[in-house]
Amino acid sequence: WLMMNAVGMEVEITEVTDDVAALSFQGPNTRKVLNRVTEKQVDELKYFRMMKNKISGVEVTISRTGYTGDLGYEIWMEAKDALPIWDRLMEVGGDYGIAPVGILAMDMARVEAGLFMLDVDYTSASHAWIEPQKSSPFELGLDWTVALDKPGYFVGRRALEKEKREGSVWKMVG
């Protein structure tokens, strides 16, 4: 997908999937735990921002993001460092009731918070196999995620502009 959509651009794409690890660290006490284990405090890190930091001397990138609807962070590091970072978070997090949960629990929290994921909670019209599965952000009440005032082109822009002008065929309610 990246290569297909990079046609005509001067970009180089490198596969790093096996080299990078990410830990989703979510919940009301995550800031307190991070402030105890990081070299620099995370108090001033704004939503959707990132910072370089260290946990137990290991370089990490911390983003103030998450898909649970609660206070949350994502911690990015080299894959080889993931287990020691996990162990440190669990060690200090135990004082705050931090416990690991699976992806299904996180998905439920995400959906309850109204944070939907493309091709997980709904299938875009370009990928749906059957007509009833096709949906757009406007139909799902996610129009706030569409920045039509943003300059430049993005995939699906023309179709979304048309739908915004003419209205959606249906709308999800509830």
Name each model-derived stretch.
Residues 1-174:
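Conserved, structured C-terminal
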